[in-house]
Amino acid sequence: MLILSIGLIHHTSNKSLYTISPNKGKRYEPFTTTSLGNFQFHVVRFLHRLIYGTQRYQELFPPIQKIKNINNVKQQRIFPVNCAADDLDLGFGESDQIELFNHPSKDTYGQFNLIQLIDIFDPPQVHAPSSADEFFKSNKGSEHIDIFDMITRQPPPFHQHQLNIETPYFEDFATPLVLPPHEVSSDDVESYFSGSVSTVSSIEPLDDEFVPPPQPPRTHTSRKRKHDSISPPASSDSSSSSSYVPQLIPSSSSSVTSNGDSPVSPTTKRKYTKKKQPVFSNVDEPIVITTTTKTNNIDVKKITTTKNGTVENRFDCPSCDASFKVKGYLTRHLKKHSTSKAFECPFFDNHGVHGSKCHPTGGFSRRDTFKVHLRALHFIYPAGVKASQRNSFNGRCAGCFQYFDNNSEWLENHIEAGKCTGTVQYKQNVSNLLLD
């Protein structure tokens, strides 16, 4: 007899074996069997029974034909769906766009007519008795003013009348109440603004919001748009003043007096022209004279230029393109091209047998450049010494490795004295003695 694990197999006969016992207290119940050939292996069913404790194993892996809507609309309809437009006071017209204002042809809001709410208020006790009340009473017969009609009056949607909009949407309440000018007097307006508001009415703080006060008449002063010089003359005859057409009179004067508010006429603007530079026809042309002179027995070209009374000299080098204003500078420069040098490096060897090719020619025409060459290439300094600190450090001679306190002592007492045993001349003399 074999004892098998729970739930991995089940019998293929009519009576199936289940892992869950009818008793809820026993979740797993082992069983014994002797016929293994009548059982089949169902792992998915076992996993669902083990996890969920139910035989409805198709809930996790349902067949495709049982899925009615993949979008799971059933779960979405359980709870109400909130919309951001629910919190706004929006109107919906015939178009598919959300309108900021109600349709102008509809007078209802929320299926209720707003004119029915007028019974809540007490119109007779709005303001204290004043002369402005007579003004409103006089206008009742001419035109019926509906307060709530003015409040709910809104411009048409933008997509319908976007070309006929004269004022912005949100300035509806800012527009003053327009009344016939012949029925309004200045005394009525002043008494309206100076009148005290009654304390009996329950809607006193909101009076100015529902009923905008009449605006006092404005006296617009005409601005002067034209220059004083071109303004028409004053005339008592209305026909002559209306038929007068101002004409621009060109003025030859450059300065025009005008008021601060009136712009300057385009014809009276000052025109600035660039002053032309005077052209002098008697300008001296440069005179160039070329001569030849000698320096160090070398013929050089001298170019003399005379311009506006000044004389300039230029000396050109015959070996290169260099030119100098001073003859002495050219004389010093010509030493570079001379084959015979006044100073020669004692460690230079063109073939590199007894020395090194430390310079293109090994010769120097100037003493200062000769010393700079020796101190830079033929004196050994300690490691890390900068070029500006070479004169204050000790070192050794690169030819014979003799020690010296500084490079000046090495140059004067060792190189110029001819005591170095590492020069090319000393090595050639030693080799000649050995060959003999």
Curated annotation (Swiss-Prot):
Basic residues: compositionally biased ranges: 268-277
Q: Which GO terms describe its cellular component?
A: cytoplasm; nucleus; plasma membrane
As for membrane topology, the entry says: Peripheral membrane protein
Record-linked InterPro entries: Transcr_Reg_ZincFinger (IPR051643), Znf_C2H2_sf (IPR036236), Znf_C2H2_type (IPR013087)
From the UniProt record, which GO molecular function terms apply? DNA binding; DNA-binding transcription factor activity; zinc ion binding
- Main subcellular location of this protein, as a coarse class: membrane
Protein name per its UniProtKB record:
Transcriptional regulator STP3
Q: Which organism is it from?
A: Candida albicans (strain SC5314 / ATCC MYA-2876)
Which SUPFAM superfamilies did the record assign? beta-beta-alpha zinc fingers (SSF57667)
ZnF (C2H2-type) intervals: 315-337
